[in-house]
Amino acid sequence: AQGATHHANSHFKILDEEGEWVDSDRLSEFAFGKLGEKVPQGACRRAPANSKVEWEIHYYPDGNAVANDQVAVGIWYYDEEDGFNEEEAYRQDLRAYRLDGGGDYMIPPHGTLMTQGFHSFDHPVRVDSWQPHMHLRGVAMALEMFNPETGRREMLSQASNWTAGWNHSHMYEDGYQPLIPAGATMIIT
């Protein structure tokens, strides 16, 4: 099979107190089959002053680089003339919230495995998009919220009959983004 970019992730690097380059916030994330991502109105990703961008790219199916491969990211800067107000904007978090374990799983032929990951925030969160990603063996993924104040568990998104060529970042429409209250738990299954 011909090789293709499987992941192309970029993040900012900043200088620490000792003058060493260290990782900072993620800039973008790409997975095979993803069409791109859009930052919603009123949101931002901050580019630290004097930072640089580092790429982490790997290839599928054999891990070998693809000759003449090109990966790009576009950055738009906004300021007061654009009507952008940094104090009112909320900062997007592109962190990958993984399933527990994060290691190798032993799945027998024709077998199944179900894993879950949990994450809570100490502040309210608006979910702008959700991207299931399970490589070759995954068949379904769900994003739920458990609210300890109500004792209710709510399904936010689900992808069933999943395929590895379908790594789209599912964007919620304006006004329909799930709101997760402080202390609630996201459940990824």
Residue ranges and their predicted role:
Residues 2-126, 131-189:
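Beta-strand-centric surfaces of beta-sandwich/beta-rich domains
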